[in-house]
């Protein structure tokens, strides 16, 4: 495998072509953003930690029957992945009220929800990734109902697997977002699963071990990511 020119740069990763049209190299950066890019900073070694955390969690999910774009970890900052066409939607899964959901619905943060909540947002930076419903997504040509049903099924499998796994590590999986890509007629879990994309709270203390520490200027951001890496790597 030969790494070639950069295909795309996002907020947290760079994507490079390879000599194989079906694969890309994903490079994890230390850049941190919040509030749709309005707040910017860096977290030392975040890319290294998120690369490792994502690799381990994707391997776990593959073993549990969730197909992903992940092929292998190349080095401390890079992964080899299948080159997918990202569906321009994020699927958000919520087990406990927090963040925007708590604010919009007037719920106390930390309230356990009576059922898991699934939401979708339209991946569009200019519009600040608005929440939409299934009918919006189909009406504007982002997907179809059959594909959406499969996306929700993938999200549910990811939630069931990760909730159980993190529970064993003494962590509550509060909520998370995933991206899904199309590849040779299949849907694959793509992007990353890390403290950047999940809310993770210590079960005993309630301590936040995720990007909320950066969003809310709580300090000890690197230490929180390191703690997640340590527990995932047990």
UniProtKB/Swiss-Prot annotation:
Keywords: ATP-binding, Ligase, Nucleotide-binding, Purine biosynthesis. GO terms for molecular function: ATP binding; phosphoribosylaminoimidazolesuccinocarboxamide synthase activity. Pfam families: SAICAR_synt (PF01259). Its EC number is 6.3.2.6. The keyword Isomerase does not apply. InterPro entries: SAICAR_synt/ADE2_N, SAICAR_synt_PurC, SAICAR_synth, SAICAR_synthetase, SAICAR_synthetase_CS. Pathway: Purine metabolism; IMP biosynthesis via de novo pathway; 5-amino-1-(5-phospho-D-ribosyl)imidazole-4-carboxamide from 5-amino-1-(5-phospho-D-ribosyl)imidazole-4-carboxylate: step 1/2. GO terms for biological process: 'de novo' IMP biosynthetic process; cobalamin biosynthetic process. It catalyses: 5-amino-1-(5-phospho-D-ribosyl)imidazole-4-carboxylate + L-aspartate + ATP = (2S)-2-[5-amino-1-(5-phospho-beta-D-ribosyl)imidazole-4-carboxamido]succinate + ADP + phosphate + 2 H(+). Belongs to the SAICAR synthetase family. This is Phosphoribosylaminoimidazole-succinocarboxamide synthase. It comes from Clostridium botulinum (strain Langeland / NCTC 10281 / Type F). The gene is purC.
